[in-house]
Amino acid sequence: MSSIFWIDLQPSVFCFNKKLACILSQSRHVRRWSFQHDLDEICSLSTIFDFLRETVDQLDSPPHVVAHGLSGTIASLFARQFPKLFGSLTLISVDPISTNQWSSHYLEMRRKLPCSRSSILSHIVPLLFDKQFNQTNLALSGFFEKCLDFDFIPGSIASHSLLPNL
């Protein structure tokens, strides 16, 4: 049975993928891939592709790739550019038409509204999860705050380039 290569560009929200990763790991070896960068440095799509290609080139055979959200968008764009490097690609919660992500909505709202980060996240979380529970919303907002502070977000200081549509 072949292994799974899980691309994870936003480790702060891996908790949403953990259950599936654990289930898959019962029958296959699951390898998680991410990278760290200094958030004060620009991180372009080509930088991510270079890191990803360097890792994939070291594998014995093209991996079966799983990716969620933004990671899935990046994986799809990578697979389009380097089709022979992935054995297969499974995308979870990826907009098949565009590169629209929760972070796109967050950044747009921050640009247009005179609201705090926490106010905007408190508004976005119930839209994403259909939850109206304050405790749950606070916890989920915390995950997204960590993601904004530490993970790759297109359009933030970490990346000045927009992602092309799929």
Stretches found by the model and what they are:
Residues 66-75:
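Gly/Ala-rich beta-loop-alpha elbow adjacent to hydrolase catalytic centers
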Residues 10, 69, 95-96:
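Short, flexible active-site-adjacent loop segments at beta-strand->alpha-helix junctions, enriched
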Residues 65-66, 89:
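Conserved alpha/beta-hydrolase fold motif
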Residues 100-102, 117-165:
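Conserved alpha/beta-hydrolase catalytic His-Asp/Glu region
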Residues 80-81, 85-115:
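Flexible "cap/lid" loop of the alpha/beta hydrolase fold
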Residues 18, 43-44, 101-104:
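Short aromatic-enriched loop/helix-cap "lid" or pocket-rim segments at secondary-structure transitions
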